[in-house]
Amino acid sequence: MSQKIIYFFLSILFISNAFSITIDGDLSDDEWSNAETLEGFLTVFPDTLEKPKYKTEVKYFTDNKGIYFGITNYQPKSTQVIERHQRDSFYANADRNYVMIDFDNNASAGYEFTVTLGDSIRDSIFVDENEFSDNWDAIWYAKTKSY
């Protein structure tokens, strides 16, 4: 089975251990072997809450430079849509992964970070659960790789 790895780094100051990785779409750096892992995702686009057809695995860790996410989508290469789009393009025709973060865990402010398999990025901010703006541009880096 082919897979695609969508990996990105959020440049948000968060103190923890001192790591050093290369942002290259490859999860072979030693830090990834000790990273926290999330699995068991459900489909939310469309909002069916069904188990997805293909497995997704998320790894994450922090260091003194930021928060790192490594996302592996186990998806046949023949079904992968690899297109590059303008930054913040919501209607991009490409496979993508979203990470949404609510640092206060109270729905007062949330941050969305999206990367497509073609390395296009999108970021936005949500305020009070439903006020949305994509005029907010964070400093962050992403690189994807398809196998």
Where are these regions (language model features)?
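Structural preference for beta-rich elements and adjacent junctions enriched in aromatics
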Residues: 19-147
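Positively charged n-region of N-terminal signal peptides that target proteins for export
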Residues: 1-5
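Bacterial N-terminal signal peptides
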Residues: 7-17
